[in-house]
Amino acid sequence: TPDSFWEGSRGGEDLALKLIDEGADIIDIGGESTRPGAAYVSAEEEIRRIIPVIKKIRAASSAAISVDTRKKEVIEAAVSEGADILNDVSALEDDEDIASFAAEKGIPVILMHKRGIPAIMQDNTSYGDVFREVDAYLASRVSYALSRGIAPNKIIVDPGIGFGKDFEANRILIKNCGKLCG
């Protein structure tokens, strides 16, 4: 996206193919920046940004393509062009229908912890016990995903390093990442 965390991501298709050549197994593509402070992007704009990238990658490689979106319309369009994984920074909270779509298609789903919306998520980075809070949130989202028909082996949890957390919270989560939802 034009306002991504990482300037290098703006190369899209060519960068993805270079990373695959260098051994990447999964390429994550997003049409809406979810960095702290980012502005909302419409589903139509997300689709316009990501579909050419997906098409070019899929034409050249069988590497898994993950799509970073919170919108059902976007993942539908992406899967129809060959995307394999839903990476939802809202952990299936922002769009009620996205979980049913993922279950129906049998695609893996990444559920990420964050606080609030990207535009303001860094405004509240204090936690009583960051590990317990993030773990409890992710466990509740896993339960929700299961209740919507997503298979247990298709669910991946992401503690959301850098999303609504300060340095110390990030350090604690990285140190204990293997214990999440355990």
What is the predicted function of each stretch?
Residues 39-67, 73-76, 103-114, 136, ...:
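Alpha-helix-loop-beta-strand connector modules within alpha/beta enzyme cores
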Residues 25-31, 87, 107-116, 159:
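Non-cysteine beta-strand/loop elements that form the S-adenosyl-L-methionine
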Residues 2-6, 25-52, 161-167:
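Glycine-rich, proline-tolerant flexible connector loops at the mouths of alpha/beta enzymes
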Residues 2-20, 45-48, 91-96, 132-138, ...:
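Glycine-rich anion/phosphate-binding loops
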Residues 10-29, 59-60, 64, 76-85, ...:
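Alpha/beta enzyme core
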